[in-house]
Design a protein with these regions (language model features):
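Active-site hotspot residues in diverse enzymes, especially metal/ion-binding acidic/histidine motifs
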Residues: 1-219
Length: 219
């Protein structure tokens, strides 16, 4: 069975629109918390609730789920999800893991399809959510040369995540969806580079720190 990469990309784009994402780096945690029937907690919180040592809990989840895992259960014929994540990992690794779990939920994965197919689709969803193509188009529309370093800095991606994005197969997302996301990001991109030019006058850097920028960002 072949993963449906196009559906994953479309669903990620629709998620950005539905939850009004207009700035980067994209944070999947607030999105997860807004979805009815989804409960999010850390591994530490889960171990406290289960009265189980954290290491034993991680062993129970398995070595493939040390960043985040989602458990699904039915109640009143409705799906409910418990997303548990490891907040001790670097923040952007946690964000990618949560974006992947969000993908499983949005794509309606329920275990009826092969594990490798579901994982590929969820990863594709995460990549399109965290580094949406329309965000890159917004940078290009600002008359700046799009480079990997520039995109990585704005999207907040570690190198390993960015390399995974480049390996994703080409997909087609409806133009009207891409236009909405691009237009949503444009004010942020314009503001971002105005701040960079201003900051460079004082510290001589070519690209000021993203965290400092967010502290000064005004909608």
């Amino acid at each position: 069975m072949t993963p449906d990469y196009q559906l994953s990309a479309i669903k990620a784009t629709e998620t950005l629109i539905k939850y009004g994402i207009k700035t980067a780096p994209v944070d999947p945690l607030p999105i997860l918390k807004q979805i009815p029937g989804v409960f999010v907690m850390t591994f530490a919180e889960a171990s406290d609730m289960a009265h189980m040592d954290r290491k034993d809990l991680l062993s129970l989840y398995g070595c493939d789920n040390l960043d985040a895992v989602t458990n699904v259960y039915l109640s009143d014929d409705k799906k409910h999800y418990v997303v548990t994540y490891n907040r001790l990992l670097p923040s952007r690794i946690v964000d990618m893991a949560l974006a992947r779990e969000l993908g499983h939920i949005v794509l309606g994965h329920d275990g009826t399809r092969p594990e490798d197919v579901r994982q590929e689709e969820a990863r594709c969803f995460a990549h399109h959510l965290m580094c949406p193509r329309p965000l890159i188009h917004s940078i290009s529309a600002s008359n700046l040369r799009v480079t990997e370093d520039l995109v990585r800095n704005i999207a907040g991606f570690p190198d390993c995540c960015f390399s995974c994005i480049r390996k994703q197969p080409g997909v087609t997302v409806p133009a009207e969806l891409n236009c909405i996301v691009r237009d949503n990001f444009m004010p942020y991109i314009i503001n971002f580079f105005e701040y960079q030019r201003h900051a460079a006058k004082y510290d001589g850097s070519a690209l000021a720190d993203l965290g400092t920028y967010m502290d000064n960002y005004i909608e």
